[in-house]
Amino acid sequence: MKEVIHSTLAPKAIGPYSQAIATNDLVFVSGQLGIDVSTGEFKGADIHSQTTQSMENIKAILKEAGLGMDSVVKTTILLKSLDDFAVVNGIYGSYFKEPYPARATFQVAKLPKDALVEIEAIAIK
């Protein structure tokens, strides 16, 4: 059985996908851009603003599922530039405590809406 998770405190999906899907003991959060739900636009044009908003969007979606950031077991970070790796790490690290989730980070040629970062997460109930 699967359940759609949708938070009004995070932006709507920009394509044919759900913000998150819960199934059995897992919640799969789709990639989140740094879009501010109140404006529908990026929180800012810089990596700091976009990363922070991406993480806040994940946090809001998890909250809708009754979970917190401490439930996250795996993340994937997509970056327009690996030059932003240190900044993203600093912000990312402020959302988690040890033991940190497993993670993969990739540089990609382009992200939706020309975003600088996209972050997806898997959490356990």
UniProtKB/Swiss-Prot annotation:
Gene Ontology MF annotations: deaminase activity
A Pfam family hit:
Ribonuc_L-PSP
Q: Which GO terms describe its cellular component?
A: cytosol
Sorted alphabetically, which SUPFAM superfamilies does this protein's record hold?
YjgF-like
Hey, which family's this protein in? Belongs to the RutC family.
Q: What is this protein called?
A: RutC family protein jhp_0879
Origin organism of this chain?
Answer: Helicobacter pylori (strain J99 / ATCC 700824)
